[in-house]
Amino acid sequence: MDKINPDWAKDIPCRNITIYGYCKKEKEGCPFKHSDNTTATTINDVPPPIDVGEATTPTMTSVPKFNAKVSASFTPMTVGSDSLTTVTNTTSAATNATGNIAMAATSATASTVNPMINPIVNSSLVNNNNNNSNISISIPTTASSSNYDPFNAPIFTPSSTSSIHTNANAHSFPFPSIANSGGININATDDNSNNMSMANNVPPPMQPPPIESSNLKYPRIYPPPHSLLQYHLYAPEQPSSLKSLLKPNERSADQLFIPNNIREDLTKKNLSILQVFPSSGKVIPSIVQDYFNLVPLNFNNNDFLNKTTLFKVFSNYDGKAYVLKRLPNIDKSMNPNKISKIYQIWSKINCTNLIKFRDIFQTTKFGDLSICLVFDYYPNSLSLYDYHFVNFPKFPITNNYLWIYLVQLTNVINSIHSQNLSIGNTLNWRKVLITGDPGRIKLSHCNFMDLLFNDDTDTVVSSGGSTIEGQQQLDYKYLGELLFNLSINIENSNNNTAPKEYRLEEITPQSIDDMRQIDDKFKDVLKYLISDNGDSKKSIHDLTSHFYDKMFMVLESSQTYTEYMESVLSRELENGRLFRLVNKLNCIFGRIESRIDINWSESGTKFPIILFYDYVFHQVDSNGKPIMDLTHVLRCLNKLDAGIQEKLMLVTPDELNCIIISYKELKDLIESTFRSITQ
């Protein structure tokens, strides 16, 4: 190979720079050109004018290449006193030039492009009365870089000033103001620039109003808003006025999938379960005992660390989500045997209307000696008070709701009293949670505090003592107080009026008779619950004798809802079957090895699979426009999965050849092809 002439190659860019970003032969005598801008340019050196009407195309040599091997990690620029420079026109000839573009550099010498530096180009548009235009573009010098802390960064506040300025000291887009920086204020309003832009009929761009940074208090909860599940982007159901009448054997597309309300509810619950709270471990510990990823559920309290708090946690044993209730500042002299006895007693209770108690332990992870109680987690659950009086949209209280609540709470009392325990004053409308429809409720927790701080635990759980029997009799009164407060606020649940809460000593038989919103049978139940029977004691048997007929109504509604959910699951089961069939088709269709296999050619045995795939998923109308018919897809996949003897005609894209084949033959061909891949 002949030697390269250095005089001829010195003006030709090196190909290694273009391809790789660098040339390893540069220091060994590579004769080609390795740097583009080696000449010095001063501020007074004005390049030759460029005709605006003439189109210019940049060459490959003028475009810098990114070198990933020598580039450093991204470091944001900080605004300093030397970060911006003001460019002024030094000659009157440049200002009076018509249709010329002047490029001014801020440094004495122009260097090659460094990927570590991201210069901000600031442009100012000036139009004078003589219709002479001069577009001046300035590139600021490299600002001093510093370490960026995302947790201590100021909240972004958009600027309300115009982004078109004649002063080069202002950026063309807003920045958060930096106090005590010693540099210029890039959010300051330039009166001269605003007046000039208005004088030349340059309308300022529309920008959002300024937002006070002190009012932006968002909890840093993962996932961020941009990765939330977009359940609301599904197509809504058609209104009843637009739905066509279907025959008994016909189905619409909405009837083939899960209903929208159930899908959205389950999606929101899954999102609540999967949310985590990235904490530094200073305020909220990362791991407590066998639980991790603590997410506060009541972090709106002012005194967060000194109050009873609830956390959503994940277990190391099974990976499921639970609720951890922390009781702070516990006496160090507490007997550990008392804690173990509480767990042994309450963990035996299995009631569908009582949240299951899972674990109890002591910990010092919160900076003090705390007792933690672990329960099952029900996402997006609301208390009776929030469900009917606070949450939007409100669900009004009806007589059917009252009977449903009474039956379920009676079941809780029966389960707890059968274990020789009592509920206590936790039986109120802020401790009873709505976990689902129709009116399914669960009692959150019972009197653990009394058991923990009672000096004599044996008297609380004794079977023959008067203490436990007296507390069980109080449970009936607490139930009557809860139902009375719900009944008397039926009208308040339909409007925005605040609910009235009555104490037990304020409820009288006369106040029950004065209520017109409930029937007489429910009034008899309330009178029985709040009355003092003297020597005779209340019991579950006597209580249920007042509304045994209503228990059948609750049982019937529960059975109906169970059958409805089973029908929904059966439809999803069919959809899962079709999903597996689509996976099989995608596994065998379009593989690289099939391009050279003669069996996949037009004369091959597996060519009908290609035609069937196009027939199902690549539909076109008579004009060749792509269309999507979900009914056609489901019908073909169901016939293929059943393997019926019905035949169909598959046509090639050029419409020159066709194949007549049955769904059974197609199914056998797909199954054999899939087995040949997996084996």
From Swiss-Prot:
One of its GO terms (biological process) is postreplication repair. Regulatory subunit of the poly(A)-nuclease (PAN) deadenylation complex, one of two cytoplasmic mRNA deadenylases involved in mRNA turnover. PAN specifically shortens poly(A) tails of RNA and the activity is stimulated by poly(A)-binding protein PAB1. PAN deadenylation is followed by rapid degradation of the shortened mRNA tails by the CCR4-NOT complex. Deadenylated mRNAs are then degraded by two alternative mechanisms, namely exosome-mediated 3'-5' exonucleolytic degradation, or deadenylation-dependent mRNA decaping by DCP1-DCP2 and subsequent 5'-3' exonucleolytic degradation by XRN1. Changing F156A: Significantly decreases interaction with PAN1. GO terms for cellular component: cytoplasm; P-body; PAN complex. Phosphorylated by the cyclin-CDK complex PCL1-PHO85. Residues 588-679 are annotated as: Knob domain. A motif (PABPC-interacting motif-2 (PAM-2)) lies at residues 143-163. The keyword Phosphoprotein applies. Belongs to the protein kinase superfamily. PAN3 family. HAMAP family: PAN3. The modification Phosphoserine is found at S252. GO terms for molecular function: ATP binding; poly(A) binding; protein kinase activity; RNA binding; zinc ion binding. Keywords: ATP-binding, Coiled coil, Cytoplasm, Metal-binding, mRNA processing, Nucleotide-binding, Phosphoprotein, Zinc, Zinc-finger. ATP binds at K325, D376, Y377, Y378, P379, N380, S381, L382, S383, R430, K431. The N-terminal zinc finger binds to poly(A) RNA. This is PAN2-PAN3 deadenylation complex subunit PAN3. It is found in: Cytoplasm. The keyword Lyase does not apply. Pfam families: Pan3_PK. It comes from Saccharomyces cerevisiae (strain ATCC 204508 / S288c).
